[in-house]
Design a protein with these regions (language model features):
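Short acidic/histidine-centered micro-motifs embedded in hydrophobic/aromatic stretches
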Residues: 8-9, 46, 130, 134, ...
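Conserved, charged catalytic cores of large soluble enzymes
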Residues: 77-115, 135, 139-155
Length: 221
């Protein structure tokens, strides 16, 4: 397997270039003692200085962890998994897709070319931002379709919404894998698929139980 080393610009900590010898910033091991490795990878990749020096603070790293990983991505996975497990004994694809479902799945299908091109150009910060934009799209889809309300009157439609969201979550895990491989694998291994595209939209199996998944990330106080 090929390894790629990227020589980048400098990361600044409180206006100074990070330097272990001068005591500016923390060592990697000091961060790993406190952080989920994937959360640390995300925080650092979000601040990658590709064209010019960039400044990063621990407060900003914590904010990204809490707001983007815990509240946006982790919460998305948890609420879809929980709603499927609590309301259906197995993954169901019952109702036909409607326009809002088709729109999300089309966007997820197109996401691979968009993010892939950014990665090929080594625009990793932009690729990560774009990947998280799709997480926001799935959250927006759920907020618009409100399956927790729909299920009270139309169980088949609620099942379709959650199935569509699960397909999109699987794609989000694919997009985020280059940046957060461990947690992405946790998500992907919990979702049963009919297809095994690592970089493409997958068809999710129906009639089977969804595996349990724990919290992906912990919130910093």
């Amino acid at each position: 397997q090929r390894q790629m080393c990227i020589r980048d610009r400098y990361i600044l900590v409180k206006g100074e270039k990070a330097s272990a010898s001068r005591g500016v910033g923390k060592t990697l091991q000091e961060y790993l003692d406190q952080w989920n490795p994937d959360a640390l990878r995300y925080a650092l990749a979000s601040a990658l200085p590709e064209q010019s020096d960039t400044e990063i603070s621990e407060d900003e790293m914590i904010r990204r962890n809490n707001e983007e990983l815990v509240a946006a991505w982790g919460n998305l996975v948890q609420r879809v998994f929980t709603q499927i497990q609590n309301n259906f004994s197995k993954i169901s694809e019952i109702d036909e897709t409607v326009e809002v479902d088709k729109k999300l799945l089309k966007e997820m299908s197109e996401s691979y070319d968009i993010v892939g091109q950014l990665i090929e150009k080594v625009e990793l910060k932009a690729a990560l931002q774009e990947s998280m934009r799709y997480v926001s799209k799935v959250n927006g889809y759920l907020n618009e379709t409100e399956p927790w309300k729909v299920i009270k009157e139309d169980e088949k439609r609620a099942a379709r919404i959650l199935y569509t969201a699960l397909e999109a979550i699987d794609s989000c895990a694919n997009l985020l894998y280059p940046f957060m491989p461990s947690t992405s694998d946790l998500v992907r291994s919990a979702i049963p698929r009919e297809t095994e595209n690592l970089w493409g939209l997958n068809k999710i199996k129906t009639g089977v139980e969804l595996k349990e998944i724990g919290l992906l990330f912990n919130k910093f106080d």
